Amino acid sequence: MHFVEAKGILSSNNGMNIYRGCTHGCIYCDSRSNCYGFTHEFEDIEVKANAPQLLEKALKSKRKKCMIGTGAMCDPYLQAEEKLKLTRRCLELIDKYEYGVAIQTKSTRILRDMDILKSINAKAKAVVQMTMTTYDETLCKILEPNVSTTHERFEALMQFKKAGIPTVVWLTPILPFINDTKENINGILDYCMEAGVKGIICISICIDVFFLKP
């Protein structure tokens, strides 16, 4: 883990990534791609130490309220967040200035910030997006070894349902011959129905092509 002083925090579509890199160890992760310009090892987390200060400046300068998104490129609830609490500090600012938030994660650590998310949802809108890849817990621990299991994520969704916070599930990636079975997909859909999610996102089937040198 290393710290940097970032120049900006919000993208043109109001997305932010407080961290760069990941320690979840998901074997299918495409964020490792060279197209994202990483200059450090993916597991060596880059921490934008001044993220809260940059976010506050950006929120103050906006003319219209909007939804702030986080989690598209890097999970905001990595293990490092337990100690650093940068995601929590940014949520506190979103709450303070009465913006909405859409936050994507695979970690039940998000439950720590239930109080702030409830406050944001009362003033604007808070949407929790949880990725679910496989209903099979054994397979989950192989595909995503260092993060909450699918059942633990389901239990978190149930807590957000009880709190009245809308949720969305990313059913992705679908990996041919690995998690593309009827039993797996139906199992996740059953979780989604029980948790009362407001939407299910399934982008595409994931097929990686490897070119071997002769």
Tell me what each language-model feature is.
Residues M1-Q129, D136-K141, T150, F154:
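Conserved Radical SAM active-site core
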Residues E82, C140-L143, D180-E183, G187:
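A short secondary-structure junction signal
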Residues R109, T134-D136, L175, D208:
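Surface-exposed, flexible loop/turn segments at secondary-structure boundaries
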Residues I120-A122, V147, N186-I188:
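Short, hinge-like loop/turn segments at secondary-structure boundaries
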Residues E137-N146, T172-F177:
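Surface-exposed cleft-lining segments at the edges of enzyme active sites
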Residues E152-F211:
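Conserved C-terminal portion of the radical SAM core fold
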